Every structure is written in structure tokens, then in C-alpha cells.
Amino acid sequence: MPAPGPTPPAAAPSRAGPGARSGGRQVGRRAVLSAPLLLIPGGTRARPAELRFRVVRNGSVIGTHRVAFAEAGEVLTARTEVDITVKVLGITAFRYAHRFEEVWARDRLRSATSRRDRNGTVTELRARAQEGAVLVEGSAGRFHLPAEAAPLSWWDSRRFTRPLFDNDTGTPLQLRWTRRALPGGGSLWQASGGEESEGTYAADGTWTGWKTRAEDGSTVLYEPA
């Protein structure tokens, strides 16, 4: 990671936002759970109107991750904001910002847009549904994906069995998923085949945490804010 002055260990997750590296598919918390609830199109499960996490590395908070939901009839819009700043001796050594919006109509993706700024280098993505397909254009190229394709966003574990694409570059992903039950009815989903990441979910499906390996091998955690 380029940085002014001393180069610190890479502090960002190996994928933005969070997502996963390139590669179809295989198969406090109190504040999160007390937020207003929305019904998800295509189902009856409710979800908080907003999710907030602290991004923690080596015991220090280095950023925030926020997902805000808006519902209009059968259309659900999710807006993700990730901001990470790492300073060394008072100097900003690493800066990362990701803005990602996805629009769903029932259980199908209608559109998605992404803008990622990593130390001043900007990449963008656009995806849109067409009859029988999802067309994705990003820094990795243009892709014609199945109609049920979805960006890899960890706030909804139900999409993990779909064809997935990277929410920054647009690259189709090839991940292997395992699910483990947690005490109290929750679950833990682990992804492999491109990165080591895992997400935790409450019994009602609410996303409650995330863990991944950063580019320097350190562990990055998401804790409810």
C-alpha cells in the first residue's frame, strides 16, 4: 500500500466494503437490534433500518461501516458507506472510502453503483438488470450475468447461494460457503476461495459482525457501533 513516510502494514480488508477478491458461486449489538425495522421485499423477515459497525484492527478503531435501508413498496434500496483512515505518527498513511448502492425489487437486483477511493485512486462500477440477465460494468470489464446474480454484500446472507460478483470491480466470484449454527439460533457464514472472511447473524438474520484478513495478514473486525 503506497503511503507517505513510513509504510505501515496494510490496514484495509483484502476486499472493500466488505466484498471478496476476484474469482460463480458455491455453495453495540443492542443498538443494531433496537433500530426501526423494515420488511424485506420478497419475504416477511424484518431488518433494522440501519446497521452501523466500527472497523477494528489490532485493537484500534480505524473506521466505520454503515448500511442504510429505504423501502418504497416492493423496492428496497441499501446504501453502504465505508470510511477507513490509518495514521502513523500523526500522518495519514492510508485512506479508504467506498460508497455502494443497490436497489432490489422483490428478490431480484434492479441496479447497483459503486465508487471506491483508495488513497486517491478511484474505481467505479455500474450494474443493471435487463430481461433475463444482470449487466455489470466495472474496472475488471463487462460481464453478462444470470438474472439472479447479486453483488457480494454481507448484510443479507440469503444471497450467498446466488451467482455473486465483486461489489467494486464487478468480477464474478467463485467462493465456497459453509454455515455453522451459533448458540441462541444465530449463524456464522464462512467464505473461502479467494479470501478468508466470515459473517455472524442473529436468529432473525440480522447481520451482527464480520471478520477478515487484511492484506498484511492482520485481522480486521466489524463490531456493532
Question: What would you call each of these model-derived segments?
Answer:
Residues 22-48:
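N-terminal twin-arginine translocation
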